[in-house]
Amino acid sequence: MLKLIQNNREITALIAILCLFGLLSVIDHQYFSLQTVTLVFSSAQILILLAMGATLVMLTRNIDVSVGSIAGLCAVIMGMSLNAGFSLSVSCLLTLLLGMCAGFFNGALVTWLKIPAIVTTLGTLGLYRGLMLLLTDGKWIEGLPDELKRLSAPLWLNISPIGWLLMILILAMAWILAKTPFGRSFYATGDNLQGARQLGVRTDSIQIIAFSVNGVMAALAGIVFASQIGFIPNQTGSGLEMRAIAACVLGGISLLGGTGTVIGAILGAFFLTQINSGLVLLKLPAWWNDFIAGFVLLAVLIFDGRLRCAIEKNIRQQKYARFLKNDKSNQVT
């Protein structure tokens, strides 16, 4: 039973989502509907993108706490580019390039200079956030064009163009991680770094790619943020990194690396966003969001640690069970 839960964390996250849907449907009978699912999915798109990027980094046994600042900085660059007269496609390209460079910088510091990931990204968190405020002079960016806002406008099945693009990205990343040698390299790097090197995996390159893709996902999150609300506050992205990590852990991504799937992380992001919608339904203040996200993260970490200890204990018992049986039989004879 313990192994079943450990090996199927996506199913447990899905069950949690369905249970929460059931609970909220008791309060409001119209809550459990296709419209609600699409609305929650639309609200979850930013967190899903950040969780997808965080998945790659965490699989390699690293962590990035600067993604919220990267998303905010990229949103600012997006807004400034559009207001400067650049086309939407050029502005998006510049934004994605900036996100990739920011992620690459994090990865280079971690792999080439051997600075611990948590220390590196704590430093760049302040660096990117400060650069964002310097560029805007602490002001909001407003007056964004309608063509940007149309990216998040409902389309077929009440899902926006960005929503459909996101689903394609989810399927592509899930397939790459599960079915390709390149994808399995992320698991090998996080599970056993030295062993992966002996098998020919270019672990430094894999880690840099993980951070770079993480930066691109953060840039996409910044674009989605700008398109959804139509302006860019000076605190855009603040606190999102903790929610992204919480979503990954909730979905079964191990902080020790080498374990988990991107589908699990996405379900975790959906669940956390669903909690937010539940708070709106219950008419609770918005500042409960961070408290609940922190509580869920702590609870999942405790559960994950206890589950891991229980599984290891069970494996040890099975390993030495036959020796104990032999000792007992010798004592009887």
From Swiss-Prot:
Which cysteine pairs are covalently linked by disulfides here?
A: none
Q: Which domain of life is it from?
A: Bacteria
Write down the membrane topology.
Answer: Multi-pass membrane protein
Select a single GO molecular function from the record's annotations and give it.
Answer: transmembrane transporter activity
Q: Which UniProt keywords apply?
A: Cell inner membrane, Cell membrane, Membrane, Transmembrane, Transmembrane helix, Transport
* Keyword Membrane part of the UniProt annotation: yes
User: Single GO cellular component annotation?
Assistant: plasma membrane
Cellular compartments annotated: Cell inner membrane
Entry-linked Pfam families: BPD_transp_2
Q: Where are the transmembrane segments?
A: 14-34, 39-59, 70-90, 93-113, 115-135, 157-177, 206-226, 252-272, 284-304
Keyword Transmembrane helix tagged? yes
| Function noted in UniProt | Part of the ABC transporter complex LsrABCD involved in autoinducer 2 (AI-2) import. Probably responsible for the translocation of the substrate across the membrane.
Describe the subunit structure. Answer: The complex is composed of two ATP-binding proteins (LsrA), two transmembrane proteins (LsrC and LsrD) and a solute-binding protein (LsrB).
Q: Member of which family?
A: Belongs to the binding-protein-dependent transport system permease family. AraH/RbsC subfamily.
Q: What name appears for this protein in its UniProt entry?
A: Autoinducer 2 import system permease protein LsrC
Q: Which organism is it from?
A: Photorhabdus laumondii subsp. laumondii (strain DSM 15139 / CIP 105565 / TT01) (Photorhabdus luminescens subsp. laumondii)
What are the leading ranks of the lineage? Bacteria, Pseudomonadati, Pseudomonadota, Gammaproteobacteria, Enterobacterales
